[in-house]
Amino acid sequence: MEPAVGGPGPLIVNNKQPQPPPPPPPAAAQPPPGAPRAAAGLLPGGKAREFNRNQRKDSEGYSESPDLEFEYADTDKWAAELSELYSYTEGPEFLMNRKCFEEDFRIHVTDKKWTELDTNQHRTHAMRLLDGLEVTAREKRLKVARAILYVAQGTFGECSSEAEVQSWMRYNIFLLLEVGTFNALVELLNMEIDNSAACSSAVRKPAISLADSTDLRVLLNIMYLIVETVHQECEGDKAEWRTMRQTFRAELGSPLYNNEPFAIMLFGMVTKFCSGHAPHFPMKKVLLLLWKTVLCTLGGFEELQSMKAEKRSILGLPPLPEDSIKVIRNMRAASPPASASDLIEQQQKRGRREHKALIKQDNLDAFNERDPYKADDSREEEEENDDDNSLEGETFPLERDEVMPPPLQHPQTDRLTCPKGLPWAPKVREKDIEMFLESSRSKFIGYTLGSDTNTVVGLPRPIHESIKTLKQHKYTSIAEVQAQMEEEYLRSPLSGGEEEVEQVPAETLYQGLLPSLPQYMIALLKILLAAAPTSKAKTDSINILADVLPEEMPTTVLQSMKLGVDVNRHKEVIVKAISAVLLLLLKHFKLNHVYQFEYMAQHLVFANCIPLILKFFNQNIMSYITAKNSISVLDYPHCVVHELPELTAESLEAGDSNQFCWRNLFSCINLLRILNKLTKWKHSRTMMLVVFKSAPILKRALKVKQAMMQLYVLKLLKVQTKYLGRQWRKSNMKTMSAIYQKVRHRLNDDWAYGNDLDARPWDFQAEECALRANIERFNARRYDRAHSNPDFLPVDNCLQSVLGQRVDLPEDFQMNYDLWLEREVFSKPISWEELLQ
């Protein structure tokens, strides 16, 4: 008797009767490689329905999509980073810059082009342009600034290809840097920031457009091009360029600009914009320049990894168990399971192709929980692992005694198996070993020894072996060492001696940020909220479109479409810059000192960063990552080299041919990493993830088939699984399996169950207050010299040296000195007897 095709009803399989061979399946019925095979038809009715229901629960919102060929890096390709600086509305200004340069150039050089001059002539003209920035007339100064911008843009009017433009850009920018252009631009930028007339005019305007920020945009464009180009290293760079790069990086991170690093000036612009005092500031350009400045001065992720390894060796810690960047790059994305409807559809298409057999339920569970995602190259390995109990070597983990047809022969490339071994080495904290020993002692001996991790007297042999294994995988982080050292300094301030604080760029930047760090974090999150695609336009929200909206709004449908693409792209670039800045600062501060990181992280949490990021992901994340908000023919440098074709609605809708949008995927990964940084080892913040119902939001993000993004989503799901209840864990077994496969294991972490000691009532306030007290003590000890304990300060007992000290009095006090004497000295009665006693 034949089973009903595709139906989940009762199945009767007669294994005694010979079955006719199944007809060859149609080509369309083949499932894509990696898709789970439809097994629902092999079950009795009730179990099939239950299986389908569980499938639907676990894979709600999943769909089969191709792996995204995305490689995470500090930045996108150089050309892409250059093009994102300019909005499409700024297009006509390229020709204005060229015109300003050529008018000035023809006065001094009549018979040659810029590209035909020698190095000395280039340097002479660059210095002449630099002198022109010092004129008082605003219009003349703007023309000279535009001419310098044209030089920084690669004098594209004399180039025939994009590669030639980029080559001349590098040459021209190092030339401009050599003659001191950047410092002159910083002074001009400072002047524009303090330009109260422009600020008050912008505040009064009902609608701010591109024209209100012309001067600022030109200056920021040149500075961005200098920072971005100098930061990019090329193999063909001259030796003097490499030296200039190192010098420039050191200067950019030093407190040379108003006694603070250049990044602090840009942070000040961000807060001034958010406070409403300067609504005309071109925020996208400010944020892009801020990101590249932080990246250039502090270093990128690979540099951070080498700094981390170096710091561990200085502190006497063992090397890192693996290079996390390399591990993540070698990971493959997990295939999301097909939904129940997909399974039924595949089964109907397959028809009577396969013999049916009854399968044990526990084997089917094992089958469903598997997540094959790595191609295996040899059949021999698979055969060797057949009698292993693990699921690694078997394509289908089914019992040998079941009646099964021979497997279909697939091409070698289509065969999928699990990877051999887990990607990460497990880690154990000192605290975990202490807790394990404490529970073992109280269980077997009846008393505890506190933090003693060496005494194992009276404990059974298996416990000895467990402790040995735990100690083999013990990992001490730099943060733990720094926290212990800080406790020691506070416990014994005299015997501990003076702390030697190395003035690395991260330390200098933190000292500059410290007085106003909460305001900076709130300002960045305000702009992030305004730029998020999920945020609704509100009257009280800040206007981040000042540097993209033209003076005259579009009148045709085509112009409106172009502006719509431009506005969306503008918002995406802002999200990209803010997410990158926050992540870089968190990572560098954590390496420099854990309490610097905790201070910044706590202010992000207090400013509602966690719900803001969850709100960002509460959208169709797949459509955000594949959004086509770009017009490639209008991107720089393509638009200045080639003739612009006539734009049509079809060409605007088509966008580029890329499988995904690099900047959007980069932003999503950064935001997930920030969320991980904020919640890691923080029980109270993990509970915020649970309270804000983040699990379904994060699970939807697993649709994106990109290994790095999936890893950080799974990490966030892992920390909250113990609080989500047994039913959630039961109906999300595939997600649990993916966590097991991809996320690092803590050997005695009970993450998959609800019986952990940490699953205690939520006391957010106590945990955060204790952390805040530690941070305040650290900041007061290291940076707040005014509030130092007077008992520990040196005392000068010499009368002559005390009277000989010069005291700087403010000017207004000196002018009104007589008045002060009259009020504070002569008019007040003095009891000389009491004073002399």
Swiss-Prot record:
GO molecular function, one term: protein kinase binding
InterPro entries named among the record's database cross-references: Far11/STRP (IPR040185), Far11/STRP_C (IPR021819), Far11/STRP_N (IPR012486)
Name recorded for this polypeptide: Striatin-interacting protein 1
Function according to Swiss-Prot or TrEMBL: Plays a role in the regulation of cell morphology and cytoskeletal organization. Required in the cortical actin filament dynamics and cell shape. Part of the striatin-interacting phosphatase and kinase (STRIPAK) complexes. STRIPAK complexes have critical roles in protein (de)phosphorylation and are regulators of multiple signaling pathways including Hippo, MAPK, nuclear receptor and cytoskeleton remodeling. Different types of STRIPAK complexes are involved in a variety of biological processes such as cell growth, differentiation, apoptosis, metabolism and immune regulation.
Superkingdom of source: Eukaryota
Subcellular localization: Cytoplasm
Annotated TM spans: none
Family, as annotated: Belongs to the STRIP family.
